[in-house]
């Protein structure tokens, strides 16, 4: 049996759920939120769906800009916590966005600055090593 997951600008929470759940598991159940461009989405925490009508201000910003957004919201369930949100694109068309609470905010830069271990260069992108 073949199953296909399709995401569009108008996908609803239930259509986004399989991808959001997979990412949630991949990031060790950190809070994950996902929405389409035109409809509210889903929010997951601790392995559970906690919201199926999630608007997400930072998700909307990433959709509008069409680029990754790192921010610390001042309102909403993640107020005061750093988040990272990536747009979901089909070419130049932004279909939605997915984000995660970024518990790593700043620590990688600190670790790299402290260690400056050259053997790490082959595993990390260029911008991970500010010069």
From Swiss-Prot:
This is Uncharacterized protein MJ0405. GO terms for cellular component: plasma membrane. It comes from Methanocaldococcus jannaschii (strain ATCC 43067 / DSM 2661 / JAL-1 / JCM 10045 / NBRC 100440). The chain crosses the membrane at residues 68-88, 94-114. Its main location: membrane. It is a multi-pass membrane protein. Signal peptide: none annotated. Keywords: Cell membrane, Membrane, Transmembrane, Transmembrane helix. It is found in: Cell membrane. InterPro entries: UCP006557 (IPR012029).
